[in-house]
């Protein structure tokens, strides 16, 4: 911010905040995570996942929080069509290993695991039926409970379909199916990093 950088706030901010060409018509709810216990964005995403009845599509670079993974598993077990899109090769090997600890349970529950190659997934998007959330919230302990984060939520079938059409479907088409860890070393590493998941 201007204040954080020690400078005065400019008199004319129009160059930074130009008027949109279209004001839009989709209402957006804004929720935050503020360190110290205000976790409205985290709670909104929890409720979104818990409320899914038909579909749940999740794209996120870091999915290590046991509570969120439990909710994703619960959605699949109650018959929701669930797809999880992550990086095939992440910039955080520990977070990838921690998530892979859940691959057997996720696969058994019917979750489609998709790993996007040749890039690091950076989107933080959840589509649950016709509710969409997007923003800065990774599904890990730092983002959900400790960092300053923000999420925007839209209850809109049209928005949900646009996100599916422009983000999920093309990326899933380029992705490879995720497979559970194989071999004693990989299984041990995934167990270890999952055990330390609250620090990731």
Describe each region flagged by the PLM.
Residues 1-200:
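Charged, low-complexity intrinsically disordered terminal segments
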């Amino acid at each position: 911010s201007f204040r954080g950088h020690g400078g005065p706030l400019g008199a004319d901010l129009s160059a930074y905040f130009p008027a949109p060409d279209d004001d839009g018509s989709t209402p957006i709810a804004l929720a935050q995570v503020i360190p110290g216990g205000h976790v409205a964005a985290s709670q909104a995403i929890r409720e979104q996942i818990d409320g899914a009845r038909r579909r749940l599509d999740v794209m996120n670079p870091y999915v290590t929080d046991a509570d969120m993974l439990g909710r994703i598993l619960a959605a699949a077990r109650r018959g929701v069509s669930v797809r999880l899109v992550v990086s095939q090769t992440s910039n955080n090997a520990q977070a990838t290993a921690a998530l892979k600890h859940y691959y057997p349970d996720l696969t058994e529950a019917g979750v489609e695991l998709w790993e996007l190659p040749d890039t690091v997934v950076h989107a933080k998007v959840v589509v649950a039926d016709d509710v969409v959330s997007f923003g800065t919230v990774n599904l890990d302990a730092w983002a959900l409970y400790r960092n300053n984060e923000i999420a925007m939520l839209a209850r809109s079938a049209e928005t949900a379909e646009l996100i599916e059409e422009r983000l999920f479907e093309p990326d899933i088409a380029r992705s490879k199916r995720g497979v559970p860890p194989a071999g004693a070393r990989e299984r041990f590493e995934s167990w270890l990093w999952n055990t330390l998941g609250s620090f990731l």
